[in-house]
Amino acid sequence: MRLQNDLISELFYMKINGIGVTSPDQEMNMMNQGIVRIGGDVFGAFDDEVITALTNTQDLIGAVLRIHFCLEEFLNIWCNKVTDNKDFFDFGFIGFDKKIKIAVKLGLPENLSIIFKLFNSIRNKYAHDTSAKITIEQLNDIRIKIDSLPNFGSQPIPKCDDPLFETPVGDKILSWNGINISTKDRIVFLYFVFSMKILGAYVAEFHKRGISFNYVR
């Protein structure tokens, strides 16, 4: 079941296929299909090298750190846009947890912030103990909260554990209950679905505030 959620879904679908490290023939095929690539104001959160490394890594810790980096960029984007700053956090190091609090003070929806915190707690666990385990209970908690987020397109994003919900990530086809799916693949799958819902929420929230927002290259 291919993701369908208007233009946002199309962008997401292409991005998780590793667009950004394409051959000239693949780029031409995209152009012929009228497909655009994620960029603009959210380029930092969809950095080609980071996303490509995330889709291809077999290392759980590496995946967690890259997801954390991308989520931090989403927080930066929120704070930059709502304050009309090019770099809101240009005054020195601010930890991820404090960035969440600042973003919430600046209007970031609470339902998004809760999921940011859950991903951050996993990252922090690894930061203090590289032998730490991510439990299925932790992942299910994130999954349920992602599924509860609103959809902003004409066709809703399926529930993460919908048996028909499959999506390509790198050279794999992932589904929540896929045969032999690893913890690393599950957390990557959750992140990509969450990033799609973040993007949809940002489009809606910035439009409501009359803030210009460009998410294509």
Name what the model sees in each region.
Residues 2-121, 125-217:
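Amphipathic alpha-helical interface elements
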